[in-house]
C-alpha cells in the first residue's frame, strides 16, 4: 500500500463542504450533480470517482479515506497516485489478467496500471450530465499476453425514483402516505462505454465498484442454492441464505471476496446499515442495479483456480489494512479482442435514508427480500440469525489463498 497510513478504527464523517474543499485545494476538477430533492453527488476527475450522495450537504454515504479531512493529507494521497481514494469507480477487468503479474503470487505481484487508476480524465458537463473519458494502456499477464488499449467513457446523470409509479397498498408508507415520500432519496445512473484495441483475443469488461462504509449487511437478490465462490479467505458464517437471496455481513474487519454466478442473480445488490443514534431507529439503503447475463463470458477468476469463472456480481470486505471499507461490485458486458464493437452498460445507484421499517420496505420492493429480514439486519442481526447458514450448501469448493498476516499491499478486489 502507498500513500498516507489509514486509521482503520472507524469511519470519519466527511461532509460535502470538506470533499469539495479538498478537491479544489488539490486542483482537481469536479462537478456537483443534484440527484434528489435534497441530495447531491460530486463527480471527481481524479480517478473518475463519484462521491456521495450527500443528503442535506451532510456526510458522504459511501466510504472516503480520512485524508479528506485535511488539505495536506489529501494532497499527499493524490501526489502518491494511489487508487484508494474512496467513492464509486469503474475499473476494467479481469483483475487476474491486468493487475496480477503472477497468479501464484497474487498479493506480491499486484500492480495497478496508473493509466487505469488514477488515470487522466477529461471532464465535461452538459446540463445534468457529467462526462468523464480516459484511455488506459493495459498489459495482459494471462493468455493471450500482450498490450490492450481501452477507451472508457462514463456519463453520470440523475436517476428517477425507482418506486415512483407503484400503486396500491404495497406502495403506502406511514399513515397511508406514499412510501416514496417517507424516505429521503438520491439516485444516479452511470453509463459506461468500453472499447478495446489489441492484437489478440483479449477479454475485457467494465467493472463498477462502490466503496461503502462497513458495519452493515448486503443482500444479493438471488435464487435458492445460489452458487457463491470464495476468492480469498472463506466468507464462512458471515454469509447466509435468506428468503429472496443471500445476506452477507460486511464488517470491515474480515478479509474476503466472493462472487455470485450470473444465472443465479438478478443483477441487484442492496446494502443496509444503521445510521445516527440507535434510539432513532434509522437506516440507509444502497441498491446497485446492473444487467446480469448468464450467456456472457464473465472472465474474473480466483488466483488458484484457472477456469473457475462466470460471476457477474462480487462483494469485497477489507480487514482494516486498507481502511476498513467494503465494496459492492458489478460487471459490465464482456468484450473480446482484437477490435470488438464498443459496448455500453448502465449501472443504477439508488440510495434511501429514513426510518428503518420504511427503508426495509423499499428494499423488499427492489430486492425481493422480506422487509422484516432487512429491518432485522439493519438493527444488528447477524446473517446466521436471518436464515439458515449457506456457507456449506452455497459456497463452492474453490480453494482460497492462505491468509496473509502482513499488511495488505495496494489492491483490494
Each PLM stretch: what is its role?
Residues 2, 6-189, 193, 197-247, ...:
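Surface-exposed acidic/polar loop and edge beta-strand patches at domain peripheries
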Amino acid at each position: 500500500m502507498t500513500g498516507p497510513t489509514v486509521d482503520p478504527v472507524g469511519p470519519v464523517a466527511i461532509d460535502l463542504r470538506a470533499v469539495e474543499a479538498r478537491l479544489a485545494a488539490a486542483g482537481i476538477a469536479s462537478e456537483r450533480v443534484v440527484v434528489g430533492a435534497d441530495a447531491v453527488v460530486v463527480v471527481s476527475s481524479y480517478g473518475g470517482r463519484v462521491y456521495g450522495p450527500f443528503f442535506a450537504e451532510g456526510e458522504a454515504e459511501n466510504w472516503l479515506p480520512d485524508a479528506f479531512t485535511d488539505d495536506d493529507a489529501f494532497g499527499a494521497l493524490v501526489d502518491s497516485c494511489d487508487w484508494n481514494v474512496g467513492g464509486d469507480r469503474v475499473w476494467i477487468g479481469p483483475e487476474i489478467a491486468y493487475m496480477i503479474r503472477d497468479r501464484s503470487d497474487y498479493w506480491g505481484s499486484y500492480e495497478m496500471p496508473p493509466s487505469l487508476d488514477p488515470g487522466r480524465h477529461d471532464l465535461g458537463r452538459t446540463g445534468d450530465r457529467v462526462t468523464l473519458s480516459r484511455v488506459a494502456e493495459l498489459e495482459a499477464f494471462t493468455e493471450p499476453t500482450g498490450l490492450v488499449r481501452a477507451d472508457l467513457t462514463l456519463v453520470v446523470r440523475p436517476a428517477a425514483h425507482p418506486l415512483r409509479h407503484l400503486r396500491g397498498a404495497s406502495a403506502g408508507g406511514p399513515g397511508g402516505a406514499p412510501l416514496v415520500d417517507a424516505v429521503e432519496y438520491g439516485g444516479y445512473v452511470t453509463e459506461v462505454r468500453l472499447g478495446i484495441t489489441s492484437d489478440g483475443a483479449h477479454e475485457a469488461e467494465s467493472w463498477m465498484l462502490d466503496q461503502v462504509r462497513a458495519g452493515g449487511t448486503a443482500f444479493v437478490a438471488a435464487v435458492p442454492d445460489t452458487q457463491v465462490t470464495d476468492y480469498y479467505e472463506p466468507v464462512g458464517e458471515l454469509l447466509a441464505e435468506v428468503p429472496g437471496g443471500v445476506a452477507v455481513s460486511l464488517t470491515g474487519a474480515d478479509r474476503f471476496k466472493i462472487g455470485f454466478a450470473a444465472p443465479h442473480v438478478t443483477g441487484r445488490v442492496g446494502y443496509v446499515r444503521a445510521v445516527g443514534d440507535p434510539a432513532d431507529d434509522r437506516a440507509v439503503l444502497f441498491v446497485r442495479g446492473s444487467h446480469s447475463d448468464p450467456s456472457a463470458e464473465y472472465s474474473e477468476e480466483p488466483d488458484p483456480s484457472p477456469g473457475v469463472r462466470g460471476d457477474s456480481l462480487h462483494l469485497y470486505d477489507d480487514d482494516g489494512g486498507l481502511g476498513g471499507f467494503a465494496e459492492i461490485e458489478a460487471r459490465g458486458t464482456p468484450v473480446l479482442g482484437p477490435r470488438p464493437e464498443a459496448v455500453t452498460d448502465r449501472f443504477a445507484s439508488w440510495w434511501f435514508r429514513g426510518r428503518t421499517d420504511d427503508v426495509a420496505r423499499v428494499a423488499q420492493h427492489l430486492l425481493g427480500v422480506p422487509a422484516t429480514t432487512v429491518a432485522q439486519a439493519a438493527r444488528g442481526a447477524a446473517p446466521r440469525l436471518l436464515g439458515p447458514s449457506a456457507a456449506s450448501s452455497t459456497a463452492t469448493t474453490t480453494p482460497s489463498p492462505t491468509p496473509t498476516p502482513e499488511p495488505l499491499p495496494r489492491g483490494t478486489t
